[in-house]
Design a protein with these regions (language model features):
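Negatively charged, low-complexity tracts enriched in Asp/Glu with abundant Ser/Thr
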Residues: 1-43, 72-73
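Short beta-strand micro-motifs enriched in acidic
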Residues: 52-56
């Protein structure tokens, strides 16, 4: 059993490779309870996303703009998001669709 199982599950709930291609997501990183990534240019000016599994078995999404010195600016957080709402919340915040269908 991999300690990145949660990160892999989050990515599959977002749409897997379709999500990666549609959003320009790259530089994925995972921990025991989270997935983080850089995302492409979007209407919110966010370029970094971290999704964390919390103790209530729901997700917390943190969008921010990382500067070249890795400082976080314009941080927006959404808490207690269910797995079936991840893609809808992502689309609502960034304006990017996560798949064609």
């Amino acid at each position: 059993m991999s300690n990145l199982k949660v990160a892999e599950t989050i990515l599959s709930q977002l749409g897997g490779n379709k999500f990666r291609v549609m959003t320009g997501a790259k530089n994925f990183g995972g921990t025991e309870d989270s997935l983080s990534m850089r995302i492409g240019r979007n209407s919110s000016n966010s370029n970094y996303l971290k999704i964390t599994l919390n103790s209530m078995d729901t997700y917390d999404m943190k969008f921010c703009k990382l500067t070249r010195r890795f400082e976080e600016k314009s941080v927006t957080e959404y808490n207690n998001i269910y797995n079936d709402m991840l893609t809808d919340q992502f689309t609502a915040h960034t304006g990017m669709y996560t798949s064609l269908f």
